[in-house]
A protein has these predicted regions:
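CE4/NodB-like, metal-dependent polysaccharide N-deacetylase domain
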Residues: 92-116, 135-139, 161, 192
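Short, acidic/polar
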Residues: 30-43, 88-107, 128, 155-156, ...
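Structural motif corresponding to the early beta-alpha repeats
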Residues: 77-90, 103, 113-120
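Active-site mouth loops of central-metabolism enzymes
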Residues: 22-33, 82-90, 122
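N-terminal binding-site loop/beta-alpha segment at the start of enzyme catalytic domains
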Residues: 1-76, 132, 201, 282
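Beta/alpha (TIM)-barrel catalytic core signal, keyed to glycine-rich beta->alpha loops juxtaposed to Asp/Glu
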Residues: 84, 118-283
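Residues at the N-termini of beta-strands
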Residues: 49, 110-113, 144, 169
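Acidic (Asp/Glu)-rich catalytic clusters
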Residues: 14-15, 63-73, 100-109, 159-163, ...
Length: 283
């Protein structure tokens, strides 16, 4: 399975005709000035999946890059996230539609995937945001809907009000030091695709001796090993960089495979919630 992966590999989504690219490109903290350039570099390198959010304040720049790339819109998978609920469903829906306009300003523009950015903050907020996302999906402005930073209990709680359930994606922090095994196991048992943000641990582990030894063994960078690890765990990694050479290198992960011993060694680095650099979900 793993050896046959390519940059064009995709995963099916529940009850959806869409295919989610196995590798995504993250743009968190990519400023307006650099975001367009970075996205164009990523698209030229073969990425076909860009992950942004309202909170990142660069949706418009992502949309601009998609237009400038010359690649058909249908060939690029765009994800965004709604950060907080407004006072009611209609106001929250308008925030989502505003994001869609920024990302795809055609009359029939759409976003492929829209997530609740932090499903662990407010149960009432989740209810409002999900209803707004369901409306946007019903109208074709959003193709699929999901969650981020959700544990089992947050997703289970949605059953009480959701017309669309389960969410097609759960995007959580994932890397060898924070494997969130319970959330991953639950999500995958429900057919929910698991996406990995911070797969490179923001370069904080670049000097880790265990990681370095595996990178040296394969003549790869530590970042390439971490991206490949995610792919072989059946997670969808979303590596982020604004350095062109690193953007390209992070996509060059399909010519090698981590063996069973490599995977076991990396699995053994897990520190549970203490290994998180952003957030470990509460299950």
């Amino acid at each position: 399975m793993a050896a046959k992966l390519s940059i064009a590999s995709t995963l099916p989504l529940l009850d959806s005709p869409a295919q989610l690219p196995r590798l995504g490109f993250g743009v968190y903290k990519s400023t307006a000035e650099t975001c367009v350039r970075s996205c164009l570099t990523a698209l030229k390198a073969g990425y076909r999946h860009i992950d942004t959010a309202q909170f990142y304040a660069n949706e418009e720049q992502v949309g601009q890059a998609v237009k400038e790339s010359g690649i058909p819109r249908s060939e690029i998978y765009i994800t965004s996230k709604v950060m907080t609920a407004s006072s009611d469903v209609p106001a929250t829906y308008e925030k989502i539609v505003d994001s869609v306009r920024k990302l795809d300003d055609r009359p029939d523009g759409y976003v492929d995937l829209f997530l609740i950015h932090n499903a662990s903050i407010s149960a009432e907020g989740n209810k409002i945001m999900w209803a707004a996302l369901e409306q946007a999906k019903a109208e074709g402005k959003v193709k699929d809907i999901g969650v981020s930073n959700a544990g089992k209990r947050h997703i289970e709680a949605m059953k009480d009000y959701a017309k669309v359930w389960p969410p097609v994606v759960n995007q959580i922090e994932l890397h060898p030091w924070n494997q969130q095994r319970e959330a991953v196991k639950y999500s995958q048992s429900q057919g929910i695709v698991v996406e990995a943000y911070c797969p490179l641990v923001r370069n904080l582990k670049a000097d880790d001796k265990t990681l370095l030894s595996i990178a040296e063994k394969h003549n790869k960078t530590t970042a390439q090993v971490l991206v490949r690890y995610c792919l072989q765990k059946d997670w969808v990694p979303l590596p982020k960089s604004d350095t062109p050479s690193r953007i390209e290198a992070n996509a060059d992960v399909f010519g090698f495979e981590l063996d069973a011993k490599d995977m076991e060694t990396l699995d053994n680095l897990d520190q549970g919630p203490w290994g998180a650099i952003v957030q470990a979900v509460d299950n």
